[in-house]
Amino acid sequence: MKLLKLPADQAWKHVFEFVKKTSFCKSIGSKAITYQLKYIENQIHFNCLTRNDGNDEIVSKEMFIEFYESILKIETVNTNTIKTLVPNSLYRMRSPMIALLKACGLLQNS
C-alpha cells in the first residue's frame, strides 16, 4: 500500500476528522479485527477486546506524528515493511495505526 505524502500536521487533522465521524476501523490483515475509535483531548483511543486485555491503547498527536514521519520515506507500507522504522514506543501499535491510515484514506492500495 502507498502512503499519501502529506505534512504530518495535515495528516493528523485528516485522521482527527475521520475519527470524529467514525467510531471504528477494521484491520487489514487476515484476522477480522474491529478497532473501536475515540478522540479524547488530542489523543486517539483504540479499543479491541483481543488486544491489551480490552483496555484502550492511546496514541497522542505527538506519537502519531512521530509514527507518520517515520514511514513517509518508504514506497510500500505494511506492518512488515515498517518494523525497523517505527519507534519502539509505537511498535505494538503498527496494526491499528495502519488500519486507521487505510480507513481514513491516507494509505491506499498500490
Enumerate the language-model features and the residues they cover.
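Long, low-complexity, charged/polar intrinsically disordered regions in eukaryotic proteins
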Residues: 1-62
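Surface-exposed polar/charged interaction patches
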Residues: 18-25, 70, 74-77, 104
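Generic serine detector
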Residues: 23, 27-30, 60, 70, ...
